[in-house]
């Protein structure tokens, strides 16, 4: 008799929630259905948007006979890495001028986080540092915990961030938790458009956060997935990152170009490394090269070429910033419209937090039972946390979504 399959005891894993939500949405035959769960931009017709500048650059690449499909270097396309880091740090960054910045092209922002996490687990503040505490915000993007756990970190903690009662930032709780963190702990910070809350610290609050982190010797690991996409302004969305440079921090910054270029399936990311001196950066990159070699070995070229071509050409760059502002402005408009409708309906509670928040997501304050009601009774798909993708709202579905939220809040406590 043949032995059972070697995979017979493998348990069925739980599906990734946000993708299951989209699958459920697709299978729903109800014509009223609305998908507010997907983490991607949608037009007012609820369609994905290929940025006009991206179409233009893709055509340019297709017609360039000098390009080929040879392997890129392990660390990625040099021009892309340089342009990406410059976008985060600014043209006049002292770190760039002093040549103490490095970049690693990665498979999206997740890949940048993972390469950074793997490096820190091996080399941060010595060797084999898997017991170093890693702090993530409460709440945070669910993959943060998973990535650092997979890299081997054994002590992942949360710092307070969201005040559910006032529906805003719990600054004092955040500062207290960082103040009490062991020295040299790693702290994951959302550079802008905090996911899932959409609530960001002000510049003054960032200064307080930096002050605590500096005297506790905490290591910042920025996640910058929405530069330009949050406020429509590239500089404003990078303010925190640039302030930390000015304060002399060494840090990592995981960058994603999925949202601000609409290149979701090209997996275009960059890990920017800021150190104290050029020689240290070279050593760090030499070790990261070893990590990349056993992870994906060489990154893909197409998305990196699109981003590098755009960022390095003044005319294309200007067109791109216009495209990004188009997306950011539509989201801001949808926020205002949703809030106005809920207030007009006299929906119980306060709704100013919808317009106080920025970026793609809004943390509505809806509880899991209300979310369940919206999914099952109204065919409006959103995460159990109450997070919605604001770009899933359109001029055609706004009234339906607002009245449905009103109904859920009124009927379900």
From Swiss-Prot:
- Write out the annotated subcellular location: Cytoplasm
Q: What cofactor does this protein call for?
A: pyridoxal 5'-phosphate
Where N6-(pyridoxal phosphate)lysine occurs, residue numbers?
A: 259
Which of the residues bear the PTM Phosphoserine? 149
Q: Which SUPFAM superfamilies match?
A: PLP-dependent transferases
Keywords, A to Z? Amino-acid biosynthesis, Aminotransferase, Cytoplasm, Phosphoprotein, Pyridoxal phosphate, Transferase
User: Main EC class of this protein?
Assistant: transferase
GO CC entries = cytosol
Q: Cross-referenced Gene3D superfamilies, in alphabetical order?
A: Aspartate Aminotransferase, domain 1, Type I PLP-dependent aspartate aminotransferase-like (Major domain)
Q: What is its EC number?
A: 2.6.1.1, 2.6.1.3
GO biological process: one example? aspartate catabolic process
Residues given in the record as L-aspartate binding sites: 39, 141, 195, 387
**What terms describe the molecular function in GO for this protein?**
L-aspartate:2-oxoglutarate aminotransferase activity; L-cysteine transaminase activity; phosphatidylserine decarboxylase activity; pyridoxal phosphate binding
Which reactions does this protein catalyse? L-aspartate + 2-oxoglutarate = oxaloacetate + L-glutamate; L-cysteine + 2-oxoglutarate = 2-oxo-3-sulfanylpropanoate + L-glutamate; (2S)-2-aminobutanoate + 2-oxoglutarate = 2-oxobutanoate + L-glutamate; 3-sulfino-L-alanine + 2-oxoglutarate = 3-sulfinopyruvate + L-glutamate
Against PROSITE patterns, the record matches this protein to: AA_TRANSFER_CLASS_1
A Pfam family recorded for this sequence: Aminotran_1_2
- Source taxon at top rank: Eukaryota
Q: Which family does it belong to?
A: Belongs to the class-I pyridoxal-phosphate-dependent aminotransferase family.
| Further information | In eukaryotes there are cytoplasmic, mitochondrial and chloroplastic isozymes.
By what name is this protein known? Answer: Aspartate aminotransferase, cytoplasmic
Annotated organism of origin: Pongo abelii (Sumatran orangutan)
